[in-house]
Amino acid sequence: MIKMDSDIFDLIKKANETTLKKHGNEISLERAIFLSWWCDKGDCAFCYMSTQKDKIKDPTKARRNVHNIYAEAEMCKRLNWNIEFLSGGYKSFTTAEIKEIATTIKNITGDSVWLNTGITDELEEYGSEIKGITGAVEVANPELHQKVCPSKSLDKISNMLDVAGDLGFQKAITVILGLGETLDDVDYLIDYIKDHKIDRV
């Protein structure tokens, strides 16, 4: 278990030294490209899309125009920003549509993209347009995850990430701090990253 050090500035200095040693002093600007404001699940306690589900009568109208998505990718390329991932709520686009969007973005930017579009069992449909798959773990505590994201099974997320690795994709997870986790949960998070061979958090 990690104990809180009384001198936080020493910890920050040590973290900075470690970061510079491991990653250098260059940073990149990244932007997530959102595909839609609709999510079929719509019950994650922290998510804006959860506040919109009952207000959206026709989910197709909450989808972004794909040409606007492509224009955003072109702007990212011209600004030399990385695209963090494509993000969209559950059932906002089909797998075939996501594949087409990702392929076009790869053609625009010259780089494959990460996906953060929910749990899927259709990963084999994707190819070189996809760099990696992101699992929305969100909370570093399984019991709290069940309360915060009741419709997103942590077991299904974990299985999807393992399958993604078997198919040759890189793997990432999203974790949001401040949803009720404690320092005791850090050990669980570190073990999760190791057990599922996560490339990026």
Segments predicted by a language model, with ranges:
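Canonical Radical SAM [4Fe-4S] cluster-binding loop centered on the CxxxCxxC motif
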Residues: 21-68
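Canonical radical SAM enzyme core domain
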Residues: 55-69, 92-128, 137-139, 177-185
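Conserved C-terminal portion of the radical SAM core fold
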Residues: 83-86, 132, 155-201
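An N-cap/entry alpha-helix motif that binds or orients negatively charged groups
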Residues: 1-30
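Glycine-rich, proline-tolerant flexible connector loops at the mouths of alpha/beta enzymes
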Residues: 30-33, 54-57, 84-96, 144-145
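Short Fe-S-cluster ligation motifs
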Residues: 68-89
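Non-cysteine beta-strand/loop elements that form the S-adenosyl-L-methionine
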Residues: 44, 127-141, 198-201
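Short, well-ordered coil/turn segments that N-cap beta-strands
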Residues: 21-27, 80-82, 109-113, 129-131, ...
